[in-house]
Amino acid sequence: MERFFENAMYASRWLLAPIYMGLSLALLALTIKFFQEIFHVIPNIFAMAEADLILVLLSLIDMALVGGLLVMVMISGYENFVSQLDIDEGKEKLSWLGKMDSGSLKNKVAASIVAISSIHLLRIFMDAKNVPDNKLMWYVIIHMTFVLSAFAMGYLDKQTRH
């Protein structure tokens, strides 16, 4: 009976596979939105103010960071919790493939969240004159919470590895 439960629990990890596949659909949706934004900007590029163009570029950078985060979570999550990826020898292989454990994945996700939060904060500061001071304060507090959390997770991970 114990053996049955252990095998069933171990096999249940495959329930994560469709979730990771769903993340690839989310990446497709993000890609569509990315190009929608580019196609929206191109006809208006000469009429746009520099600040507006910078805001659009920050939005595109933000989408690229989120896309990278999705790929990282998708691939390393699959490798850590479901099954190892079997990539043919002749094909290009990501340098971190097979090397990222759940601790380093957490740190990379935290660093990505800080980067994404930084982009959002920069976009808000570009329009700071239209944002109430108390809202700006909360945006900075939330961003600093992300930064401190990322540092704390990295520090704790380093302490537990030694």
Curated annotation (Swiss-Prot):
It is found in: Cell membrane. The chain crosses the membrane at residues 10-32, 53-75, 136-156. GO terms for cellular component: plasma membrane. InterPro entries: UPF0114, UPF0114_bac. It comes from the Bacteria. Signal peptide: none annotated. Pfam families: UPF0114. It is a multi-pass membrane protein. Disulfide bonds: none annotated. Keywords: Cell membrane, Membrane, Transmembrane, Transmembrane helix. Its main location: membrane. Belongs to the UPF0114 family. This is UPF0114 protein PA4574. The lineage of its organism: Bacteria, Pseudomonadati, Pseudomonadota, Gammaproteobacteria, Pseudomonadales.
